[in-house]
Amino acid sequence: MRRRRRRDGFYLAPDFRHREAEDMAGVFDIDLDQPEDAGSEDELEEGGQLNESMDHGGVGPYELGMEHCEKFEISETSVNRGPEKIRPECFELLRVLGKGGYGKVFQVRKVTGANTGKIFAMKVLKKAMIVRNAKDTAHTKAERNILEEVKHPFIVDLIYAFQTGGKLYLILEYLSGGELFMQLEREGIFMEDTACFYLAEISMALGHLHQKGIIYRDLKPENIMLNHQGHVKLTDFGLCKESIHDGTVTHTFCGTIEYMAPEILMRSGHNRAVDWWSLGALMYDMLTGAPPFTGENRKKTIDKILKCKLNLPPYLTQEARDLLKKLLKRNAASRLGAGPGDAGEVQAHPFFRHINWEELLARKVEPPFKPLLQSEEDVSQFDSKFTRQTPVDSPDDSTLSESANQVFLGFTYVAPSVLESVKEKFSFEPKIRSPRRFIGSPRTPVSPVKFSPGDFWGRGASASTANPQTPVEYPMETSGIEQMDVTVSGEASAPLPIRQPNSGPYKKQAFPMISKRPEHLRMNL
């Protein structure tokens, strides 16, 4: 699992924050504007009535007898009934889900306050490692901000974000289905109807990001997770680009080489159309066992992406071949999805003719694979290399300078859904106490290096290979980029292995399973 400037502390949605202030003011109203000559409580008859109107629209007299009063102990818990302060101690570490150079991902259980007992994924990042260079700082900035802004059925949910002196914590929904990558490793290749389901859900997630002015730029099997039902969830938003709308381009060189669009490699400026190229590369990977263009090293892979013809296996249906050719066009302007219709253009293709988009968005379409899970805490779909380890969050003994810590101001976040549950649980509905008023691969990741420190925390058919025929070559649409002279390096590196189809009966067995691709590239924190 990879993945606004405001005062640090608990974030309250504006409507809740104001309402809570009014509620608390009502609870502790002591009527300081009462006239000095008003009668004291001693002058009232025992068990008598208060005969003045209470400004409740003519509400009548209130009985002051003890039978109408509620006794409660004054304590921090009973007085401070708003959202709790989230800190590492609020979570019990259960398993290690992944590790990276900058931190770990744990499976955790919340043990205090709202969501007590619920399972989450906790991503822990070391501040000292992040602030070393602008690239990693920008990665963290983008992920944190986008996760707060974007809410969609096919995008991972951020529940909490908080920090200590030396670490950043992102509490995400736990996706017990694991990575789509592991499903591909298990199956080798997908049937077309299976690929169609996943591609359809992914296209809806990409379309939602594009509506928000966000380009994803790192679509690959490792960044696609499955929930407990088998539905898709996009994760890892570190390479996203924000505020990109129609007519706007960006020039940052980033992504994972095998899935990168030619215009990114050419540094000629790119827009949201790069995500549709990546969807085509992912579709090719699902249906054939490897991305469309791979080489012995990065330079050879780039050379193939820019110049080579697209080879399509003969077993693909006409609809699949046509969609691949339209998504993998080197001329970005003529690529399917590049027009004003964006995701709608892709979804209207005959390859998706059997998809009911409304039911898909509502997650009423049954996924082709449902994880076989024993409990909510099941980690069988994750690599046992990590899950076997003892979960330990190392002591937070590092200290950053005050200027370095300024970078992380406003990092704290609480999901609106949590605030809503707090509002429901701690509603300030008045009980009659007294007459007072009461008033939410070798994959090759390339990260962006440009960073501005200002405004940091802003806002079918079977895929059988029984008939081995020579793949058919289809000439790809040419453009100026194919004339580029790419120097091929003599550096040696292992080629991307091609998955072989699993010809045996499908077994819904739990992992562990050893990936055929280098482990150090499977977890990017």
UniProtKB/Swiss-Prot annotation:
Residues 424-525 are annotated as: Autoinhibitory domain. The keyword Phosphoprotein applies. InterPro entries: AGC-kinase_C, Kinase-like_dom_sf, Pkinase_C, Prot_kinase_dom, Protein_kinase_ATP_BS, Ribosomal_S6_kinase, Ser/Thr_kinase_AS. A motif (TOS motif) lies at residues 28-32. Signal peptide: none annotated. The modification Phosphothreonine is found at T252, T412, T444. The modification Phosphoserine is found at S394, S434, S441, S447, S452. It catalyses: L-seryl-[protein] + ATP = O-phospho-L-seryl-[protein] + ADP + H(+); L-threonyl-[protein] + ATP = O-phospho-L-threonyl-[protein] + ADP + H(+). Residues 91-352 form the Protein kinase domain. This is Ribosomal protein S6 kinase beta-1. It comes from Mus musculus.
